[in-house]
Protein backbone atom coordinates (compact mmCIF):
# COMPACT_ATOMS: atom_id res chain seq x y z
CA UNK A 1 0.00 0.00 0.00
CA UNK A 2 2.86 2.36 0.80
CA UNK A 3 4.59 1.84 -2.55
CA UNK A 4 1.49 1.76 -4.73
CA UNK A 5 -0.81 4.26 -3.00
CA UNK A 6 1.45 6.21 -0.67
CA UNK A 7 -0.40 5.05 2.45
CA UNK A 8 1.70 4.45 5.55
CA UNK A 9 2.26 0.83 6.52
CA UNK A 10 2.01 2.01 10.14
CA UNK A 11 -1.58 3.14 9.66
CA UNK A 12 -4.51 0.75 10.04
CA UNK A 13 -7.18 0.85 7.34
CA UNK A 14 -10.90 1.27 8.02
CA UNK A 15 -12.82 -2.01 8.08
CA UNK A 16 -15.82 -2.50 5.85
CA UNK A 17 -18.96 -3.51 7.73
CA UNK A 18 -20.69 -6.80 6.97
CA UNK A 19 -23.91 -4.89 6.32
CA UNK A 20 -24.25 -1.32 5.10
CA UNK A 21 -26.18 1.02 7.36
CA UNK A 22 -28.69 2.03 4.68
CA UNK A 23 -29.48 -1.65 4.00
CA UNK A 24 -29.97 -2.29 7.72
CA UNK A 25 -32.23 0.76 7.78
CA UNK A 26 -34.37 -0.55 4.92
CA UNK A 27 -34.96 -3.80 6.82
CA UNK A 28 -35.67 -1.79 9.96
CA UNK A 29 -38.31 0.22 8.08
CA UNK A 30 -40.08 -2.89 6.78
CA UNK A 31 -40.00 -4.42 10.28
CA UNK A 32 -41.94 -1.40 11.54
CA UNK A 33 -44.92 -1.79 9.22
CA UNK A 34 -48.10 -2.42 11.23
CA UNK A 35 -49.33 -5.12 8.84
CA UNK A 36 -46.49 -7.61 8.26
CA UNK A 37 -48.12 -8.63 4.99
CA UNK A 38 -47.57 -5.20 3.47
CA UNK A 39 -44.56 -3.08 2.73
CA UNK A 40 -44.41 0.66 3.28
CA UNK A 41 -43.29 2.56 0.22
CA UNK A 42 -40.72 5.21 1.05
CA UNK A 43 -41.07 8.81 -0.02
CA UNK A 44 -39.16 9.81 -3.14
CA UNK A 45 -36.00 10.71 -1.29
CA UNK A 46 -36.53 9.19 2.14
CA UNK A 47 -37.27 5.84 3.73
CA UNK A 48 -39.31 5.92 6.93
CA UNK A 49 -38.23 3.80 9.88
CA UNK A 50 -40.22 2.34 12.74
CA UNK A 51 -42.36 4.96 14.44
CA UNK A 52 -45.07 3.10 16.34
CA UNK A 53 -43.33 1.82 19.48
CA UNK A 54 -45.41 3.64 22.05
CA UNK A 55 -43.14 6.69 22.22
CA UNK A 56 -44.34 10.28 22.27
CA UNK A 57 -44.61 11.43 18.66
CA UNK A 58 -42.52 14.44 17.68
CA UNK A 59 -42.54 14.32 13.88
CA UNK A 60 -39.85 13.44 11.37
CA UNK A 61 -36.11 14.00 11.29
CA UNK A 62 -33.72 13.25 8.46
CA UNK A 63 -30.52 11.43 9.42
CA UNK A 64 -27.59 12.10 7.10
CA UNK A 65 -25.81 8.76 6.85
CA UNK A 66 -22.32 9.84 5.93
CA UNK A 67 -19.92 7.59 4.04
CA UNK A 68 -18.20 6.22 7.14
CA UNK A 69 -21.47 5.45 8.93
CA UNK A 70 -22.86 3.83 5.81
CA UNK A 71 -19.92 1.60 4.95
CA UNK A 72 -17.64 1.36 8.00
CA UNK A 73 -19.47 2.23 11.23
CA UNK A 74 -23.14 1.33 10.83
CA UNK A 75 -23.36 0.69 14.58
CA UNK A 76 -23.19 4.45 15.10
CA UNK A 77 -26.11 5.05 12.77
CA UNK A 78 -28.07 2.27 14.46
CA UNK A 79 -27.39 3.86 17.85
CA UNK A 80 -28.60 7.23 16.57
CA UNK A 81 -31.82 5.71 15.22
CA UNK A 82 -32.42 4.02 18.57
CA UNK A 83 -32.04 7.33 20.43
CA UNK A 84 -34.14 9.32 17.97
CA UNK A 85 -36.95 6.78 17.98
CA UNK A 86 -36.87 6.69 21.77
CA UNK A 87 -37.39 10.46 21.61
CA UNK A 88 -40.44 9.86 19.43
CA UNK A 89 -39.12 10.83 16.01
CA UNK A 90 -39.79 9.14 12.70
CA UNK A 91 -36.33 8.78 11.16
CA UNK A 92 -35.70 9.10 7.44
CA UNK A 93 -32.64 8.76 5.23
CA UNK A 94 -31.89 10.65 2.02
CA UNK A 95 -31.97 8.40 -1.01
CA UNK A 96 -29.45 9.03 -3.78
CA UNK A 97 -27.39 11.36 -1.61
CA UNK A 98 -23.74 11.82 -2.45
CA UNK A 99 -20.65 12.38 -0.31
CA UNK A 100 -20.85 15.83 1.26
CA UNK A 101 -17.76 16.89 -0.68
CA UNK A 102 -15.48 17.40 2.30
CA UNK A 103 -12.55 15.40 0.78
CA UNK A 104 -12.68 17.42 -2.44
CA UNK A 105 -13.11 20.72 -0.57
CA UNK A 106 -10.18 19.98 1.73
CA UNK A 107 -7.94 19.28 -1.27
CA UNK A 108 -8.93 22.52 -2.98
CA UNK A 109 -11.07 20.83 -5.63
CA UNK A 110 -13.86 23.36 -5.23
CA UNK A 111 -15.65 22.56 -8.48
CA UNK A 112 -16.12 18.92 -7.47
CA UNK A 113 -17.25 19.96 -3.98
CA UNK A 114 -19.74 22.42 -5.46
CA UNK A 115 -21.16 19.80 -7.83
CA UNK A 116 -21.96 17.33 -5.06
CA UNK A 117 -23.17 20.19 -2.88
CA UNK A 118 -25.66 21.28 -5.54
CA UNK A 119 -26.89 17.71 -5.83
CA UNK A 120 -27.34 17.27 -2.07
CA UNK A 121 -28.97 20.64 -1.50
CA UNK A 122 -31.31 19.95 -4.40
CA UNK A 123 -32.41 16.66 -2.85
CA UNK A 124 -33.03 18.24 0.53
CA UNK A 125 -35.06 21.05 -1.03
CA UNK A 126 -37.47 18.61 -2.68
CA UNK A 127 -40.58 17.38 -0.88
CA UNK A 128 -39.87 17.72 2.83
CA UNK A 129 -38.93 21.34 3.51
CA UNK A 130 -39.30 21.39 7.28
CA UNK A 131 -37.71 18.34 8.90
CA UNK A 132 -34.46 18.84 10.80
CA UNK A 133 -31.41 17.23 9.17
CA UNK A 134 -29.10 15.57 11.68
CA UNK A 135 -25.41 14.80 11.22
CA UNK A 136 -23.24 12.29 13.06
CA UNK A 137 -19.98 13.40 11.42
CA UNK A 138 -19.00 17.01 12.23
CA UNK A 139 -16.97 17.46 9.04
CA UNK A 140 -20.08 16.67 6.96
CA UNK A 141 -22.25 18.94 9.10
CA UNK A 142 -19.85 21.86 8.66
CA UNK A 143 -19.95 21.42 4.88
CA UNK A 144 -23.71 21.98 4.95
CA UNK A 145 -23.82 24.83 7.45
CA UNK A 146 -20.69 26.69 6.37
CA UNK A 147 -18.88 25.55 3.24
CA UNK A 148 -21.87 25.16 0.90
CA UNK A 149 -22.65 28.79 1.67
CA UNK A 150 -19.09 29.81 0.79
CA UNK A 151 -19.44 27.89 -2.47
CA UNK A 152 -22.54 30.02 -3.17
CA UNK A 153 -24.78 27.03 -3.82
CA UNK A 154 -28.40 27.99 -4.46
CA UNK A 155 -30.66 27.38 -1.43
CA UNK A 156 -27.67 26.43 0.74
CA UNK A 157 -28.78 28.93 3.37
CA UNK A 158 -32.27 27.45 3.56
CA UNK A 159 -30.93 23.93 4.01
CA UNK A 160 -28.23 25.05 6.46
CA UNK A 161 -30.89 26.43 8.79
CA UNK A 162 -32.33 22.91 9.11
CA UNK A 163 -28.99 21.19 9.80
CA UNK A 164 -27.92 20.18 13.30
CA UNK A 165 -25.17 18.12 14.86
CA UNK A 166 -26.84 15.04 16.36
CA UNK A 167 -25.48 15.65 19.86
CA UNK A 168 -26.58 19.29 19.95
CA UNK A 169 -30.05 18.46 18.67
CA UNK A 170 -30.53 15.84 21.40
CA UNK A 171 -29.11 18.08 24.12
CA UNK A 172 -31.37 20.98 23.12
CA UNK A 173 -34.41 18.73 23.22
CA UNK A 174 -33.48 17.31 26.63
CA UNK A 175 -32.98 20.84 27.93
CA UNK A 176 -36.64 21.50 27.11
CA UNK A 177 -37.92 18.05 28.11
CA UNK A 178 -35.49 16.45 30.63
CA UNK A 179 -37.66 13.36 31.04
CA UNK A 180 -37.84 12.59 27.31
CA UNK A 181 -35.26 9.81 27.74
CA UNK A 182 -34.68 7.48 30.67
CA UNK A 183 -31.12 6.31 31.26
CA UNK A 184 -29.48 3.61 33.35
CA UNK A 185 -27.91 4.95 36.54
CA UNK A 186 -24.30 3.80 36.91
CA UNK A 187 -21.01 5.46 37.83
CA UNK A 188 -18.66 6.13 34.93
CA UNK A 189 -15.97 8.59 33.92
CA UNK A 190 -16.15 10.03 30.41
CA UNK A 191 -13.52 12.01 28.49
CA UNK A 192 -14.67 13.86 25.38
CA UNK A 193 -12.49 14.97 22.47
CA UNK A 194 -14.32 17.67 20.50
CA UNK A 195 -13.95 17.75 16.71
CA UNK A 196 -12.18 20.72 15.09
CA UNK A 197 -15.02 21.48 12.68
CA UNK A 198 -17.55 21.44 15.50
CA UNK A 199 -15.38 23.67 17.69
CA UNK A 200 -14.96 26.17 14.87
CA UNK A 201 -18.71 26.75 14.81
CA UNK A 202 -19.94 26.15 18.37
CA UNK A 203 -18.78 25.87 21.97
CA UNK A 204 -18.31 22.14 22.73
CA UNK A 205 -19.18 22.59 26.42
CA UNK A 206 -22.68 21.23 25.77
CA UNK A 207 -21.18 17.76 25.24
CA UNK A 208 -20.21 17.55 28.91
CA UNK A 209 -23.75 18.57 29.84
CA UNK A 210 -25.24 15.94 27.55
CA UNK A 211 -22.99 13.14 28.84
CA UNK A 212 -23.82 14.07 32.43
CA UNK A 213 -27.54 13.78 31.72
CA UNK A 214 -26.79 10.08 32.18
CA UNK A 215 -27.12 9.46 35.95
CA UNK A 216 -23.84 8.69 37.70
CA UNK A 217 -21.61 9.90 34.87
CA UNK A 218 -18.82 12.43 35.31
CA UNK A 219 -17.64 13.95 32.04
CA UNK A 220 -14.80 16.20 30.92
CA UNK A 221 -14.30 17.92 27.57
CA UNK A 222 -10.57 17.58 27.01
CA UNK A 223 -8.58 20.73 26.31
CA UNK A 224 -7.14 19.45 23.05
CA UNK A 225 -6.45 20.63 19.53
CA UNK A 226 -6.61 18.69 16.28
CA UNK A 227 -6.21 14.92 16.47
CA UNK A 228 -3.78 15.09 13.54
CA UNK A 229 -5.59 12.55 11.38
CA UNK A 230 -7.72 14.79 9.14
CA UNK A 231 -9.02 11.85 7.12
CA UNK A 232 -6.46 10.94 4.42
CA UNK A 233 -3.77 13.32 5.71
CA UNK A 234 -2.75 11.08 8.61
CA UNK A 235 -2.81 7.98 6.44
CA UNK A 236 -0.22 9.24 3.96
CA UNK A 237 3.27 7.84 4.45
CA UNK A 238 4.85 11.27 3.93
CA UNK A 239 2.54 12.84 6.55
CA UNK A 240 2.39 10.05 9.14
CA UNK A 241 5.11 11.38 11.47
CA UNK A 242 3.62 14.88 11.40
CA UNK A 243 0.17 13.41 12.10
CA UNK A 244 1.52 11.65 15.19
CA UNK A 245 3.26 14.82 16.36
CA UNK A 246 0.03 16.81 16.08
CA UNK A 247 -1.79 14.11 18.07
CA UNK A 248 0.77 14.03 20.89
CA UNK A 249 -1.11 16.41 23.20
CA UNK A 250 -4.41 14.56 22.73
CA UNK A 251 -2.81 11.17 23.32
CA UNK A 252 -1.12 12.45 26.48
CA UNK A 253 -4.45 13.75 27.77
CA UNK A 254 -6.13 10.39 27.16
CA UNK A 255 -3.23 8.44 28.66
CA UNK A 256 -3.63 10.49 31.83
CA UNK A 257 -7.28 9.54 32.30
CA UNK A 258 -8.32 7.13 35.03
CA UNK A 259 -8.43 3.43 34.04
CA UNK A 260 -11.81 2.53 32.61
CA UNK A 261 -12.57 6.04 31.37
CA UNK A 262 -14.87 5.98 28.33
CA UNK A 263 -13.49 8.01 25.42
CA UNK A 264 -16.00 9.89 23.27
CA UNK A 265 -15.07 11.42 19.91
CA UNK A 266 -17.59 12.54 17.30
CA UNK A 267 -15.24 12.41 14.32
CA UNK A 268 -14.42 9.17 12.56
CA UNK A 269 -10.85 10.37 11.89
CA UNK A 270 -10.43 11.25 15.57
CA UNK A 271 -11.57 7.80 16.67
CA UNK A 272 -9.26 6.21 14.09
CA UNK A 273 -6.25 8.19 15.32
CA UNK A 274 -6.93 7.51 19.00
CA UNK A 275 -7.39 3.77 18.41
CA UNK A 276 -4.19 3.59 16.35
CA UNK A 277 -2.00 5.46 18.81
CA UNK A 278 -3.33 4.02 22.06
CA UNK A 279 -3.29 0.25 21.40
CA UNK A 280 -5.02 -0.68 24.65
CA UNK A 281 -8.10 1.23 23.46
CA UNK A 282 -8.57 -1.08 20.49
CA UNK A 283 -10.45 -3.52 22.72
CA UNK A 284 -12.77 -0.87 24.11
CA UNK A 285 -12.45 1.64 21.21
CA UNK A 286 -13.46 5.29 21.33
CA UNK A 287 -17.20 5.80 20.90
CA UNK A 288 -19.53 8.31 19.33
CA UNK A 289 -21.90 10.15 21.67
CA UNK A 290 -24.81 8.38 19.96
CA UNK A 291 -23.44 5.05 21.19
CA UNK A 292 -23.02 6.32 24.74
CA UNK A 293 -26.64 7.47 24.81
CA UNK A 294 -28.09 4.38 23.12
CA UNK A 295 -26.26 1.96 25.40
CA UNK A 296 -27.60 3.77 28.48
CA UNK A 297 -31.27 3.83 27.43
CA UNK A 298 -33.73 2.03 29.68
Question: Where are the regions that the model predicts?
Answer:
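Iron-sulfur cluster-binding electron-transfer modules in prokaryotic oxidoreductases
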Residues: 1-298
Amino acid sequence: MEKTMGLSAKRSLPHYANERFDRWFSKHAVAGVDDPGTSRMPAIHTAAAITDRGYKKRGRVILWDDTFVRYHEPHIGIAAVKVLEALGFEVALVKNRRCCGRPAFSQGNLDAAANVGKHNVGLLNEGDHSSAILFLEPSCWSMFVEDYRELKIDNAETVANRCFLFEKFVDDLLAEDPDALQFEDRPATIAIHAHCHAKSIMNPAFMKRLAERLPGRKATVLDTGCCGMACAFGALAEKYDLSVQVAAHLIEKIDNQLPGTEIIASGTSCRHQIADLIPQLRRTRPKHMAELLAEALL
